[in-house]
Amino acid sequence: MKLTCMMIVAVLFLTAWTLVTADGTRDGLKNRFPKARLEMKNSEAPRSRGRCRPPGMVCGFPKPGPYCCSGWCFAVCLPV
């Protein structure tokens, strides 16, 4: 019973994670990987365009990415 509950919670969490990190467009996951490849190729691009958030700003779930200038987020942007 506990294992079943844990599996249900895990599936719900992963579903929410996918919906939160997906683009706002229709079929957002379809075009997600080419964009990620481009950002990996030019890793300084998001920072140079001013789209990153400074340390202390709210950023969402814990994830590495271009959303924070430092690249690390745990509810707020963490300093390096």
From Swiss-Prot:
Give the sites modified to 4-hydroxyproline: P64
InterPro entries per record: Conotoxin
Region forming the signal peptide = 1-22
UniProt KW keywords: Disulfide bond, Hydroxylation, Knottin, Neurotoxin, Secreted, Signal, Toxin
Q: List the disulfide bonds.
A: C52-C69, C59-C73, C68-C77
Q: Which residues form the propeptide?
A: 23-51
List locations, semicolon-separated. Secreted
Tissue localization of expression is:
Expressed by the venom duct.
Chief localisation class: secreted
For this record, the Gene Ontology CC terms, alphabetical, are:
extracellular region
In the UniProt record, does the keyword Disulfide bond occur? yes
**UniProt-recorded Gene Ontology molecular function terms:** ion channel inhibitor activity; toxin activity
Ranges annotated as spanning the membrane: none
Stated family: Belongs to the conotoxin O1 superfamily.
* Free-text domain note: The presence of a 'disulfide through disulfide knot' structurally defines this protein as a knottin. The cysteine framework is VI/VII (C-C-CC-C-C).
Query: Which protein, by its recorded name, is this?
Result: Conotoxin MaIr193
